[in-house]
A protein has these predicted regions:
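Flexible phosphate-sensing "switch/lid" loops adjacent to ATP/NTP-binding sites
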Residues: 2-21, 28, 33-162
Length: 162
């Protein structure tokens, strides 16, 4: 945006972007904004993935769904249509599982299944994959890279922690 140009509209953001990130201090409405962007985009016909890396798990509450897991779960469009929101697209939600994402990387880059299994069962690996400082942030970036090109989604919305 140049200093003299008008800001983008919500419609243009969800129509032209592949990834949107909500970021900021705690309590500013990141999760609510991520949920609203997801609903707005799905209403316009987009296939949306809302990925949260916030351990508070508020995205599930904002979307009116049960417990979030590391597997993508599509929100039933009937939920929205029941409250007068016609959905042309779909809204899927997923919560980052740091350990699982780390394990997926090991499997992806190991030359054999045996080598992957050996590393995955190693006590030091098990500790590092869950306790190393910065692991959650690194795995969040890895997961974002993995899903941003996923043909199942037109838009990925990343909900970040405070």
């Amino acid at each position: 945006m140049t200093p003299m140009s008008a800001p983008e509209t919500l419609s243009s953001l969800v129509d032209t972007r592949r990834v949107l990130v909500t970021a900021g201090a705690g309590g500013v409405g990141k999760t609510t904004t991520a949920a609203a962007l997801g609903v707005a985009a799905a209403k316009r016909g987009k296939r949306v993935l809302c990925l949260t890396i916030d351990p508070a798990k508020r995205l599930a509450e904002s979307l009116g769904i049960g417990e979030m897991r590391s597997e993508a779960a599509t929100v039933d469009n009937a939920r929205f249509e029941a409250v007068g929101i016609p959905m042309k697209g779909s809204l899927t939600a997923m919560m980052l599982d740091t350990k699982r994402t780390f394990d997926e990387l090991v499997i992806k880059y190991s030359s054999t299944k045996e080598k992957a299994d050996k590393l995955l069962s190693n006590k030091l690996y098990k500790y590092v994959s869950t306790s190393l400082a910065g692991t959650q942030e690194y795995m969040a970036m890895e997961k974002l890279v993995a899903v941003k090109d996923d043909p199942r989604y037109d838009l990925v919305i990343l909900d970040t922690p405070p």
